[in-house]
Amino acid sequence: MLKYLNQSEAINVDLELFNEYKFSVDQLMELAGLSCAHAVAKCFPAKDFARVLVCCGPGNNGGDGLVCARHLALMGYTPAIYYPKPTPKPLYENLAHQCQRMEICSITECPRVEEAADSYDLIVDALFGFSFKPPVRADFVSVVELLQQTKLPIASVDIPSGWDVEQGKLNDCDLEPTLLISLTAPKLCAKHFKGKHHFLGGRFVPPALQRKYELNLPAYPGNELCLEL
């Protein structure tokens, strides 16, 4: 049976990928963001959902979002990035620079619900990952409110923003994405997901690590970078 990770297990799996298996952060981020773009493309074809607002947070989840936006642009989408609190580290600065040089639009103010409905077909939620602890910081209140109030479909990267990594949706969080892309392995909160599509992405987990944590990940078909659970 597929294992759903608690917060400490998710952290430890990441640490082992970095320390024992010598993956770099940017290496895993590139693979994760690419798999997210592929999952989005499977569920929301560019011919119908070309205009994508990618909302990026300050950590690794936001980095995944920046990578996803770049690959979506290469797949025929027209992404725009909302990145309210850029991380002042070379990795994130380089990812943002790559998006800029790819001529991906970056917006400085969070759109209101009506503006988003007029301007976009889909929102990618890459705000917070499995290390999130409430409450939501002031810089992100407006975008979390947009995610909770919009009628646009939402694709959440690894964890729907504002959810508890283990308990799922909290009392003050109404976010219910249409697509959840669990990275590496699903987290416990994914058991509470009621949206239409749940995908697994991040095809980089070594067999020995799978066995150690008894992840029981399903086999990815052929050369696919993501699979629907």
From Swiss-Prot:
<keyword id="KW-0520">NAD</keyword>
<feature type="binding site">
    <location>
        <position position="158"/>
    </location>
    <ligand>
        <name>(6S)-NADPHX</name>
    </ligand>
</feature>
<keyword id="KW-0630">Potassium</keyword>
<dbReference type="GO" id="GO:0005739">
    <property type="term" value="C:mitochondrion"/>
</dbReference>
<feature type="binding site">
    <location>
        <position position="61"/>
    </location>
    <ligand>
        <name>K(+)</name>
    </ligand>
</feature>
<feature type="binding site">
    <location>
        <begin position="129"/>
        <end position="135"/>
    </location>
    <ligand>
        <name>(6S)-NADPHX</name>
    </ligand>
</feature>
<feature type="binding site">
    <location>
        <position position="125"/>
    </location>
    <ligand>
        <name>K(+)</name>
    </ligand>
</feature>
<feature type="binding site">
    <location>
        <position position="161"/>
    </location>
    <ligand>
        <name>K(+)</name>
    </ligand>
</feature>
<keyword id="KW-0479">Metal-binding</keyword>
<keyword id="KW-0413">Isomerase</keyword>
<protein>
    <recommendedName>
        <fullName>NAD(P)H-hydrate epimerase</fullName>
        <ecNumber>5.1.99.6</ecNumber>
    </recommendedName>
</protein>
<comment type="function">
    <text>Catalyzes the epimerization of the S- and R-forms of NAD(P)HX, a damaged form of NAD(P)H that is a result of enzymatic or heat-dependent hydration. This is a prerequisite for the S-specific NAD(P)H-hydrate dehydratase to allow the repair of both epimers of NAD(P)HX.</text>
</comment>
<dbReference type="GO" id="GO:0046872">
    <property type="term" value="F:metal ion binding"/>
</dbReference>
<dbReference type="GO" id="GO:0000166">
    <property type="term" value="F:nucleotide binding"/>
</dbReference>
<keyword id="KW-0521">NADP</keyword>
<dbReference type="InterPro" id="IPR036652">
    <property type="entry name" value="YjeF_N_dom_sf"/>
</dbReference>
<keyword id="KW-0547">Nucleotide-binding</keyword>
<comment type="similarity">
    <text>Belongs to the NnrE/AIBP family.</text>
</comment>
<dbReference type="Pfam" id="PF03853">
    <property type="entry name" value="YjeF_N"/>
</dbReference>
<feature type="binding site">
    <location>
        <begin position="60"/>
        <end position="64"/>
    </location>
    <ligand>
        <name>(6S)-NADPHX</name>
    </ligand>
</feature>
<dbReference type="InterPro" id="IPR004443">
    <property type="entry name" value="YjeF_N_dom"/>
</dbReference>
<dbReference type="GO" id="GO:0052856">
    <property type="term" value="F:NAD(P)HX epimerase activity"/>
</dbReference>
<feature type="domain" description="YjeF N-terminal">
    <location>
        <begin position="10"/>
        <end position="217"/>
    </location>
</feature>
<dbReference type="InterPro" id="IPR032976">
    <property type="entry name" value="YJEFN_prot_NAXE-like"/>
</dbReference>
